[in-house]
């Protein structure tokens, strides 16, 4: 049996219903509403409305007692949300209409004065900015904790050597801690990006009205201070209601953070695989196979890698929504919010899971050491001749000849004698034996940012100094 169509909604009871006589198609009601996802902004919407009520009183539009009644009424609405007692009713199109409807039920007609000079265009932008400031600060604390775990492990495990790769081919000897700090350096840049975008997020649109400004001379600087918007006020009312740069910037920063975490996860997925066996995820962050009893799959890492694609998709989605929209507010903008919510929620989960994986990860130094091979010292062999005055371009050729000699003989560089090497260049002498030392190879890279023990510990200390300076001990 076909389901009966819902009755059309009465537009005359809506906040915007004054010029309407017809009713809204029920499907359009559902299509248009945003309350199912924007109700999570109830606290920010109430906070913004309380600040606006105070500004109206300051401008002489509300009497003092009216402003107090509205502010206290909004506090009661907030208590209902906190207690899970707020009742959503038909016609509550979004969080703004829901809160205003309930306020008017509680305080009477004076509640209808709250929206004086205000549009949902400047209200919604304010709510999202206010919410996003808090979320970015939480993201920063989560990334900071991940960086702290990386720094602590790097210091504790600084003696561990492992193969370094380029093109996923054997390259040079590095410290495990150097590899880990390479990712922490990327996370630090991510944190800086989040920090740097905060002032642009924390810029106040409220007081811009629908597009042309507020005719009641509300003090926008006062509102910005009330709401803690350190970026001041949006300088142009048309831009204020149309600007969604803060969404794109945040989703981009989140997307790049997820790219970095995806690359980190990919490395660990490779390092945990059978042929490598350098690391093993704890049981808390791995799963098994329904068929193969021996399997321990790095699902947490694979999901981190996969969710990076999801967040990148959100970035493309937001940009596609905004492209081609005419100046000032358009309903298209509503489509940005779910993408923003999903991005923020995903990043919170991804960073926390990454921190859990890293803090419980088991490393296998013996397997890492076993992965070191003689060919990874070929560059050191070239540098040996450099120190004897031979130009590097020549030494590179001579070292390559040694590698080829070993390959042709089916042996390693270690197996070549001094006499063998002398046939390549006469400056090879008995002291070349010192080259065949993986720890020495790492220690020779002692410049700032290098893989020597001193340099890696310096990187750790610099990261801790950064975290302390940013208040992320």
UniProtKB/Swiss-Prot annotation:
It catalyses: 2-(N(omega)-L-arginino)succinate = fumarate + L-arginine. Belongs to the lyase 1 family. Argininosuccinate lyase subfamily. 2-(N(omega)-L-arginino)succinate binds at residues 34, 121, 166, 297, 329, 334. Pfam families: ASL_C2 (PF14698), Lyase_1 (PF00206). This is Argininosuccinate lyase. SUPFAM superfamilies: L-aspartase-like (SSF48557). Its EC number is 4.3.2.1. Signal peptide: none annotated. Keywords: Amino-acid biosynthesis, Arginine biosynthesis, Lyase. The active site is at 167 (proton acceptor), 289 (proton donor). CDD domains: Argininosuccinate_lyase. The record marks 302 as: Increases basicity of active site His. Pathway: Amino-acid biosynthesis; L-arginine biosynthesis; L-arginine from L-ornithine and carbamoyl phosphate: step 3/3. GO terms for molecular function: argininosuccinate lyase activity. Often used in tagging mutagenesis schemes to generate new mutants. GO terms for biological process: arginine biosynthetic process via ornithine; L-arginine biosynthetic process. It comes from Chlamydomonas reinhardtii (Chlamydomonas smithii).
């Amino acid at each position: 049996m076909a389901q009966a169509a819902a009755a059309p909604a009465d537009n005359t009871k809506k906040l915007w219903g004054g010029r309407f006589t017809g009713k809204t198609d029920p499907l359009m009601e559902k299509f248009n509403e945003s309350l199912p996802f924007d109700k999570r902004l109830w606290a920010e919407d109430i906070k913004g409305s309380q600040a606006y009520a105070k500004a109206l009183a300051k401008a002489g539009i509300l009497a003092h007692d009216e402003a107090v009644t509205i502010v206290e009424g909004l506090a009661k609405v907030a208590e209902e949300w906190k207690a899970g007692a707020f009742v959503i009713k038909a016609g509550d199109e979004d969080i703004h209409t829901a809160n205003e409807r309930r306020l008017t039920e509680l305080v009477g007609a004076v509640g209808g004065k709250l929206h004086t000079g205000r549009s949902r265009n400047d209200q919604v932008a304010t709510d999202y900015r206010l919410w996003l400031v808090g979320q970015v600060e939480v993201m920063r604390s989560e990334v900071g904790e991940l960086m702290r775990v990386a720094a602590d492990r790097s210091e504790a495990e600084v003696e561990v050597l492992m193969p370094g790769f380029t093109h996923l081919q054997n390259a040079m000897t590095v410290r495990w801690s150097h590899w880990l700090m390479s990712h922490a350096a990327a996370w630090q840049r991510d944190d800086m990006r989040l920090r740097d975008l905060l002032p642009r997020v924390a810029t106040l649109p409220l007081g811009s009205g629908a597009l042309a400004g507020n005719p009641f001379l509300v003090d926008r600087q006062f509102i910005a201070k009330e709401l803690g918007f350190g970026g001041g006020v949006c300088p142009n009312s048309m831009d204020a209601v149309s600007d969604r740069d803060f969404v794109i910037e945040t989703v981009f920063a989140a997307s790049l953070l997820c790219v970095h975490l995806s690359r980190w996860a990919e490395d660990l997925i490779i390092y945990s695989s059978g042929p490598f066996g350098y690391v093993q995820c704890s049981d808390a962050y791995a799963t098994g196979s329904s068929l193969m009893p021996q399997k321990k799959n790095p699902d947490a890492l694979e999901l981190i890698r996969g969710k990076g694609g999801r967040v990148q998709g959100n970035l493309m989605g937001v940009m596609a929504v905004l492209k081609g929209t005419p100046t000032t507010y358009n309903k298209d903008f509503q489509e940005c919010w779910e993408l923003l919510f999903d991005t923020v929620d995903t990043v919170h989960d991804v960073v926390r899971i990454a921190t859990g994986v890293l803090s419980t990860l088991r490393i296998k130094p013996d397997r890492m050491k076993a992965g070191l091979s003689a060919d990874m010292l070929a560059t050191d062999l070239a540098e040996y001749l450099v120190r004897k005055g031979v130009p590097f371009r020549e030494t590179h050729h001579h070292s390559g000849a040694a590698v080829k000699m070993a390959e042709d003989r089916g042996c390693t560089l270690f197996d070549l004698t001094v006499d063998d090497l002398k046939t390549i260049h006469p400056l090879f002498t008995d002291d070349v034996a010192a080259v065949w030392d993986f720890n020495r190879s790492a220690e020779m890279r002692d410049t700032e940012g290098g893989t020597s023990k001193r340099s890696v510990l310096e990187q750790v200390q610099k990261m801790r100094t950064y975290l302390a300076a940013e208040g992320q001990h």
